[in-house]
Regions:
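Solvent-exposed loop/turn and edge beta-strand elements of beta-rich ligand-binding domains
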Residues: 1-185
Length: 185
């Protein structure tokens, strides 16, 4: 009598940022190769990446499977790439790397005359601070990261900011106007 044993392998992966640093806490799923909805409920198995970004799916049966991120870490964009893996040999280990990009954003504002709001004002300087201690208030622990650039008359912006909270404070008023003492989040 011949006994057939099922073939099982594993998928070993690493979750990293754009610089190759490991990211812990991301939810990864193993899905049937005919799945089209990549949710935690549809996953055959799930794993959470460790502090170093590593994750493992063990005892994955013979066949074709999909690996996909289900939930990224806060501040990172969901990687929607579907990784096709094939378990074809007993104790086979398939290795993959899932890269996440940081969420980036922009700050844009328009400086206008308080009395004549259709009149845009040029020549102001706005400092941008990162809320380094994440307390929601501009204080001495916050980092000055630069100033807004005036792109057009009265229109100021800063692009490609990493995920987080920022404050904008006018440091120089346009000629003939008083400084706005407000801090804007």
């Amino acid at each position: 009598m011949t006994e057939n044993k099922l073939i099982y392998g594993s998928v070993s992966g690493k979750k990293v940022d754009e610089n190759g640093e490991g990211l812990g806490g991301a939810l990864i799923g193993l899905f049937k190769s005919d799945d089209v909805e990549f949710t935690e409920e549809n996953a055959l198995m799930t794993a959470v990446s460790g502090d170093d970004g590593s994750f493992v799916f063990e005892n994955v049966p013979y066949g074709n499977w999909y690996i996909r991120e289900i939930k990224p870490l806060t501040g990172f964009v969901l990687n929607e790439t579907v990784y096709d893996v094939n378990i074809s040999e007993n104790e086979q280990v398939v290795e993959i790397e899932i890269v996440n990009k940081l969420v980036r954003g922009n700050i844009a504002l328009t400086k206008v005359d308080a009395e004549y709001t259709d009149t845009k004002l040029t020549g102001a300087v706005f400092e941008v601070y990162k809320d380094s201690n994440d307390n929601g208030e501009l204080d001495s622990e916050d980092e000055l990261i630069g100033t807004l650039t005036e792109k057009e008359i009265g229109q100021y912006e800063m692009n490609d900011l990493l995920y987080g909270r920022y404050f904008v404070k006018e440091s120089k008023a346009p000629e003939g106007f008083t400084l706005d003492e407000g801090v804007y989040e």
